[in-house]
C-alpha cells in the first residue's frame, strides 16, 4: 500500500473525515485493502463512523467486499450495533444473508453482541433466522447464550425454530439450562421448547444444569 492509500486507510480507521476526503481527492483508492483484506469501509463501519461510511459509499466503495475471512462491512456494523450504518450498507446493496468462513451471518453477530434494533432491522430486510454456522449454531442460540430476551422474542416471532439443534444435538433450551437463569428457561418453554429432546450423547436439557443451579431449575425441566 503506497503512502496516499495508507494515509487514507488509517484516517478512515480512526474516524478522521477531513483526512479521508483529502486523500480521496489526491487519488486514494476507496477499495484499497490491508493485508487481512479489510477495506476502509469495513473499518469505519465497525467503528461507527457514519459520515465516513456515507462518503465512501458515495465514492464507489464496494459494499460487498470481503476480508480474508469472508467478513463484510455489514457484519462488523451489526456486531457493534450501528443501526444507521447497517441501513446505509443494506440500501447500498449489502447482502444480509452473506456468511463468513465459519458460516456466521450479520444476524448471528447482532443476536450475540449487537442491539435489538439491529436484529429487528436485519429480520425486516430478509435475514434468515434459521441459518446455521459451521457448528450448527443459530441466531436464537446466540441470543440465548447472551441472555437477550428481546432479541429471542424477535427471532421467534419471525419464525426461528426454537428446537433447532447444533452439530452436537444441543438446543437453545440446553444452553439456557447450562446458563442457569429460570426466566430464560421459562421463556423458551413458553415458546415451544421441547425439554424431552436429547442431544447426540443422550443428554436432556436438565442434564446441562450445573450443580449449584439444580435446585432452582429442576422443577422447570423435569
Q: Where do the language-model regions lie?
A:
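Conserved ankyrin/ankyrin-like repeat signature
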Residues: 19, 51-52, 84-85, 117-118, ...
